[in-house]
């Protein structure tokens, strides 16, 4: 075969490969599109499992056998025919497993690590059931249908954000006027705190030498600070939030509940903890909060511990394994949540965090990976 013939042969092979790739992409797209048509089924079925306490019914069943459909429908007072369909879907999604009973005469359901994370009664640092229930309230779902309006609106902000457009006020004002939603926000934040604070604490040892007081800004129920003072018992903790939140905060050992507004001032302390607060605000407000944090801590040992997501700068080129890819996907979903539910909030890249921290006067900071959706950003007063 001459070099010219070889070149033509290789070109034909390359063209055939390209055609196959196009066909493969088309075939994949013809299936993938359906998850955007019916994607709401995932969250609706998960909410159904939480509402009926299906994971608890399986976990608490007196028999060591898999729980049959008849037993499960009796335990949760559900229609067997409808429950069978819900469970078929959730088994297919990997939330539950269906396996044969020991005698092999029937099949039954068992929990998985994922289904146990849908237990509304569990407060073990794994369940995110309160978060699912909060995000699936009609009040939080409705703004998603207005997402395109804010994307297409002028930069000057003449079009109200999705939540404001639906409810006539921002999410914080709405929560203040509707205690049920405020309670759901607080419980959603608390269940995430139970999950992530142990990871944060594991990355904090050595940071609190000489620290005797710490304020949790936007601390909600106070549970986060309660966990931190248990981990670092020499620290006096202050749970700082708006009056209507502090009014229903827990009374915990080593924690004092203090009402106030982070936009006005923050109680003086050695260190500040602020988790999932700054992403609720645009750069201008974020810088103001950070400046108030900086003013509240002393020059020598003062530090601000920020627990927030850090979005990768280079998209998938930064992703090294499946877990990293899934974590990044959650961070990007959170950014969509901020667009739907807050007026100016957003998730930030490291470059964007660098900007707001330096604008607030923090010349030095570090980012510690805690193998989670969130990272620990430590900003030093000096």
From Swiss-Prot:
**Which Gene3D superfamilies would you find in this protein's record?**
Vaccinia Virus protein VP39, Winged helix-like DNA-binding domain superfamily/Winged helix DNA-binding domain
Q: Does the keyword Methyltransferase apply?
A: yes
Q: Name one GO cellular component term.
A: cytoplasm
Stated EC number for the protein is: 2.1.1.4
In the induction comment, the record states: Expressed following a circadian rhythm with the highest level 4 hours into the light and the lowest level at the end of the night. Induced by cadmium. Induced by osmotic stress.
Q: What is its main location?
A: cytoplasm
Which protein is depicted? Acetylserotonin O-methyltransferase
Organism for this UniProt entry: Arabidopsis thaliana (Mouse-ear cress)
Q: What is the lineage of its organism?
A: Eukaryota, Viridiplantae, Streptophyta, Embryophyta, Tracheophyta
């Amino acid at each position: 075969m001459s070099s010219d013939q070889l070149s033509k042969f290789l070109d034909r092979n390359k063209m055939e490969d390209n055609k196959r790739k196009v066909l493969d992409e088309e075939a994949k797209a013809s299936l993938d599109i359906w998850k955007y048509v019916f994607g709401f089924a995932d969250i609706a079925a998960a909410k159904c499992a939480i509402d009926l306490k299906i994971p608890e019914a399986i976990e608490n069943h007196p028999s060591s056998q898999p729980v049959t459909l008849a037993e499960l429908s009796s335990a949760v007072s559900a229609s067997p025919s409808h429950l069978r369909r819900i469970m078929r879907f959730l088994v297919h999604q990997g939330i539950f497993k269906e396996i044969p009973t020991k005698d092999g005469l029937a099949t039954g359901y068992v929990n998985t690590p994922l289904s146990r994370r849908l237990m509304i009664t569990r407060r073990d640092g794994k369940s995110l059931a309160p978060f699912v229930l909060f995000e699936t309230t009609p009040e939080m779902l409705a703004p998603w249908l207005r997402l395109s309006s804010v994307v297409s609106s002028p930069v000057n902000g003449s079009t109200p954000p999705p939540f404001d457009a639906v409810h006539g006020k921002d999410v914080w004002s709405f929560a203040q006027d509707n205690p049920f939603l405020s309670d759901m926000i607080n419980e959603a934040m608390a269940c995430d705190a139970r999950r992530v604070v142990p990871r944060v604490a594991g990355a904090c040892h050595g940071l609190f030498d000489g620290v005797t007081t710490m304020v949790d800004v936007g601390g909600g129920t106070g549970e986060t600070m309660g966990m931190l003072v248990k981990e670092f018992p020499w620290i006096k903790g202050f749970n700082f939030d708006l009056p209507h939140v502090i009014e229903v905060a827990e009374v915990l050992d080593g924690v004092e509940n203090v009402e106030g507004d982070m936009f006005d001032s923050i109680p003086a302390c050695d260190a500040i903890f602020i988790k999932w607060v700054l992403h609720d605000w645009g750069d201008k407000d974020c810088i103001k909060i950070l400046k108030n944090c900086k003013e509240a801590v002393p020059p020598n040992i003062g530090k601000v511990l920020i627990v927030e997501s850090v979005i990768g700068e280079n998209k998938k080129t930064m992703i090294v394994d499946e877990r990293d890819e899934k974590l990044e996907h959650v961070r990007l979903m959170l950014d969509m949540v901020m667009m739907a539910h807050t007026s100016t909030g957003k998730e930030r890249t490291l470059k964007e965090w660098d900007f707001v921290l330096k604008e607030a006067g923090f010349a030095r900071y570090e980012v510690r990976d805690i193998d989670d959706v969130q990272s620990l950003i430590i900003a030093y007063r000096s």
